[in-house]
């Protein structure tokens, strides 16, 4: 759930930033994060285990909120680059769903609309076992959207998995809205008016620096002259306007097997 088929090695480093901010020293966790940083992807199971270990270091605290709040544009990968170049929050959410559908052939997330708001939610049956994972994912998403669309990310409600904590104030203060727990469809409801608010004229002062930072991050993963990246870009630019940028079609266009393309992505 939460936009995750896999966790990128770069995204996992938000946990390291959290450790630095909290002044936490854990050789075991540091070693595991160092290993994760060298990998293109980290399994969801391994990420959950890292989060459980972090939670044990700070019992009773809203660790998921703290870790997710550390996200920066360089942690968001290619999807982050697409969201960064969206016109508003609504466009960003629809862009994500489009990418999810085209590349995986299915939408794990569900985007619904009514007169007051837009709700993005994911099915989740794991309850407490997935609570911190869900908190980190939703907090990171909101943090990123607030960085990109100041004034366009007003929330009406948030639902999370897991038991209700004794102190819900940190959650309500961060999200700025009522927060419920024990949900099997965790998600976020955005204000229907704010979500359509154009970002033109309301960009954060550091927007261009953020965009350059993201470009540099992508260049580190695949240099500007990388033939794979150039070929992928060419095929996507040709396929998306035709409404057919599916994983099989992109693989054929690049003369790769589906398995090879998935691994390279």
What do the PLM-derived regions correspond to, one by one?
Residues 165-265:
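Extended mid-to-C-terminal alpha-helical interaction segments
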Residues 1-118, 140:
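N-terminal low-complexity or simple alpha-helical regulatory segments
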Residues 22, 61, 103, 148, ...:
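Solvent-exposed amphipathic alpha-helical surface segments
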Residues 74-194:
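N-terminal regulatory/effector-sensing and dimerization cores
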Residues 1-3, 126, 217-221:
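A ubiquitous short alpha-helical element
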Residues 9, 13, 90, 131-139, ...:
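Short, well-ordered alpha-helical segments
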């Amino acid at each position: 759930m939460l936009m995750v088929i896999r966790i990128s090695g770069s995204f996992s480093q938000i946990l390291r930033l959290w450790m630095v901010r909290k002044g936490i020293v854990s050789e075991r966790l540091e070693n595991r994060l160092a290993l994760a940083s060298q990998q293109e992807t980290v399994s969801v199971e391994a990420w959950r285990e890292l989060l459980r270990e972090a939670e044990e270091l700070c019992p009773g605290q809203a660790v998921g909120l703290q870790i997710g709040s550390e996200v920066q544009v360089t942690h968001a990968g290619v999807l982050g680059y697409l969201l960064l170049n969206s016109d508003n929050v609504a466009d960003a959410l629809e862009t994500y769903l489009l990418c999810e559908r085209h590349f995986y052939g299915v939408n794990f997330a569900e985007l619904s609309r009514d007169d007051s708001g837009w709700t993005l939610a994911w099915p989740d049956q794991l309850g407490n076992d997935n609570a911190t994972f869900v908190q980190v994912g939703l907090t990171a998403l909101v943090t990123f959207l607030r960085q990109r669309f100041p004034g366009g990310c007003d929330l009406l409600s948030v639902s999370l998995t897991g038991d209700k904590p004794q102190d819900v104030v940190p959650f309500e203060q961060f999200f700025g809205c009522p927060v419920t727990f024990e949900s099997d469809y965790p998600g976020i409801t955005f204000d229907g008016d704010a979500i359509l608010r154009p970002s033109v004229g309301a960009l954060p002062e550091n927007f261009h620096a953020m965009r350059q930072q993201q470009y540099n991050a992508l260049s580190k993963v695949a240099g500007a002259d990388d033939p794979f990246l150039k070929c992928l870009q060419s095929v996507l630019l040709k396929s998306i306007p035709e409404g057919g940028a599916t994983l099989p079609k992109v693989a054929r266009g690049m003369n790769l097997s589906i398995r090879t393309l998935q691994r390279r992505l």
